[in-house]
Amino acid sequence: MSEGFDGTENGGGGGGGGVGKEQDRFLPIANIGRIMRRAVPENGKIAKDSKESVQECVSEFISFITSEASDKCLKEKRKTINGDDLIWSMGTLGFEDYVEPLKLYLRLYRETEGDTKGSRASELPVKKDVVLNGDPGSSFEGM
């Protein structure tokens, strides 16, 4: 059994008052494993419990960031959380190092998808191959 975000145990047994199915609360373990494998050597192995721990941490992180963005939207009497709100909440919660790269990514995404709501993407020139922090592996190729 694993402990849920609210401190209650989630396990088999099915009662109706639980938080929901684990697969509904977590990103798919296969996706977590695929992302983790990018950070270890080719011959490296990742234990199942490591993937499960990261899966829980990722879900908690998403809830943490989204909750702050949701509070902001409530104060502004808006019903929809957008990418700008999530980036704002990351800066507010101490993840400032990610704010500028995420703003850049969001701008490029919006330009590619043709969605410029809430942004000034059309005012900024776009560079199609952008490299972040001098790391060619972190570029947005083909955008």
UniProtKB/Swiss-Prot annotation:
Pfam families (alphabetical): CBFD_NFYB_HMF
Tissue: Ubiquitous.
Region span, Subunit association domain (SAD): 54-65
Top-rank taxon, per record: Eukaryota
A GO BP annotation: regulation of transcription by RNA polymerase II
UniProt family annotation: Belongs to the NFYB/HAP3 subunit family.
Function: Component of the NF-Y/HAP transcription factor complex. The NF-Y complex stimulates the transcription of various genes by recognizing and binding to a CCAAT motif in promoters. May regulate the expression of photosynthetic genes, and may be involved in chloroplast and amyloplast development.
Protein name: Nuclear transcription factor Y subunit B-4
